[in-house]
Amino acid sequence: MTLVNAETNNIPFSSGEPGHFYYHQWSPENPKAWLHIMHGMSEHGARYREFAKFLSSKGIMVTAGDHRGHGITGQSMKSSYHIADNNGWEQLLDDQRELIKHIHSNHQLPLILLGHSMGSFLAMHFCQKYNSALSNQNAPQISGLILSGSNYGSPSTWRAALIIAQFERWRKGFDHSSTLLEKMSFGAFNNAFKPARTESDWISRDHKVVDNYISDPHCGGPLTTQSWCDFLTGMIELTNLTALAKINSKLPTLLFSGQMDPVSNAGEGVTKLRDTLTKSGMGNVAMHLYPGARHEA
């Protein structure tokens, strides 16, 4: 297949705020579908380049934005690793809605969402809020949902974590990071891979992927305490059964993860997520665990 404008990086998208949002796009000739990626915490959309180029060669257009506080967007807004001063999670959701509407205005294609790690929660929450409403806002219906490297925690678990994050926000300041929160969130992830080659071995079994992550200035930085508070508030809203039941029950959904992913406790969390989505009423949920794979399967 001949590729036309196969890769366009750092496309500015005005938000009406200081700085710009930026997204990346991989476009084949005559695309038959559109995959939109919501990336994870402390990374950025351009990391999905090789995956996107592969899909583009198969006729699928791929887009991936850099969230607030992340990648070129965070750099442009002078807020790297700080999502917002308040209501950051809601702003991430609204950003995705506006970006999808913007891209759809030029490409009327079936839309599949792929969310990785934090982005998987963002994609689920997006489907709760906007799946039925998008068609009334000059945007596409969502045709499929893919969740990578995800997990499940009960609302009570997230509430307990939020109390600690709020204390750290009071102690450190809203726009500062917290070593305690970082250790609580990521500190044990490498334990299963000792003796570890790096502190980021849990990311992938592919040494090149890990090394690129470590050397990338837009990866691995600690979020601010306010960003943690906003994220955890979003998790509380997302994970109760009443909220999950708002996702289109017929939406085809695929969960995949590494069988050794510490984020989901070696697949336990993503299995719980599948069961919870099914219990909430979703009738078309599949799951696959990749043997030997880690967080980025």
Positions of PLM-derived features:
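Conserved alpha/beta-hydrolase
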Residues: 47-78
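Conserved alpha/beta-hydrolase "acid-adjacent" motif
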Residues: 262-272
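N-terminal cap/lid segment of alpha/beta-hydrolase-fold proteins
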Residues: 1-30
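Gly/Ala-rich beta-loop-alpha elbow adjacent to hydrolase catalytic centers
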Residues: 115-119, 123
